[in-house]
């Protein structure tokens, strides 16, 4: 699945990741997934279709969970977007929640991982919806550095972490 998406998008190997939730042990219908990828990439994939992506990942969710922010850091402004799925089996530690955060900030991957882990511990990992747990959860923070604005100071890191908390309360 990843290789087909990478090929259609013109990306290199290991630049696409696949996530899923569902019945544990039940295999995904790979042929249907591949058919969907082949249909959606040329027809709908565009910067303007973020809301459609947030809608597409919904399963039992009743509303789209998405947000976009501009955040002032010590050296400039960055954009941050997020979308998530998950409405049940969220207790504790995210459970079946899948979260995707993107930013145009520039940062060292190790620093981003530390910042994200600390932020998740104080936000997403404290969510409880129904008391049910699951084995499927993920949060991804993708930073392309396009703004050239670097996450440098402790205040910058705190501001980024605070957004995770804000998103958790909004979602």
Named regions from a protein language model:
Residues 167-171:
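Conserved small/polar residues in nucleotide/adenosyl-binding loops
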Residues 4-121:
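Glycine-rich, mobile lid/loop segments that gate access to catalytic sites or pores
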Residues 88-93, 111, 130-134, 138, ...:
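Short, contiguous, pocket-lining structural segments
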Residues 144-163:
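A conserved active-site cap/scaffold subdomain adjacent to cofactor or substrate pockets
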Residues 122-126:
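Hydrophobic alpha-helical transmembrane segments of multi-pass inner membrane proteins, especially
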Residues 14-35, 128-150:
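Short, surface-exposed loop/turn segments at secondary-structure boundaries that line and modulate
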Residues 1-5, 141-142:
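Buried hydrophobic packing segments
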């Amino acid at each position: 699945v990843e290789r087909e998406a990478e090929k259609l998008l013109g990306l290199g190997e290991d630049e696409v990741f696949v996530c899923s939730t569902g019945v544990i042990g039940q295999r995904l219908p790979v042929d249907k997934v591949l058919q969907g990828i082949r249909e959606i990439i040329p027809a709908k994939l565009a910067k303007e279709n973020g809301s459609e992506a947030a809608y597409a990942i919904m399963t039992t969710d009743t509303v789209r969970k998405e947000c976009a922010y501009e955040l002032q850091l010590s050296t400039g402004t960055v954009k941050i977007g997020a979308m998530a799925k998950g409405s049940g089996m969220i207790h504790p530690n995210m459970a079946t929640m899948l979260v995707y955060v993107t930013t145009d900030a520039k940062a060292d991957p190790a620093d981003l991982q530390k910042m994200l882990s600390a932020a998740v511990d104080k936000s997403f990992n404290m969510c409880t919806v129904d008391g049910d747990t699951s084995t499927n959860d993920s949060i991804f923070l993708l930073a392309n550095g396009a703004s050239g604005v670097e996450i440098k100071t402790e205040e910058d890191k705190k501001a980024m972490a605070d957004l995770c908390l804000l998103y958790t309360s909004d979602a």
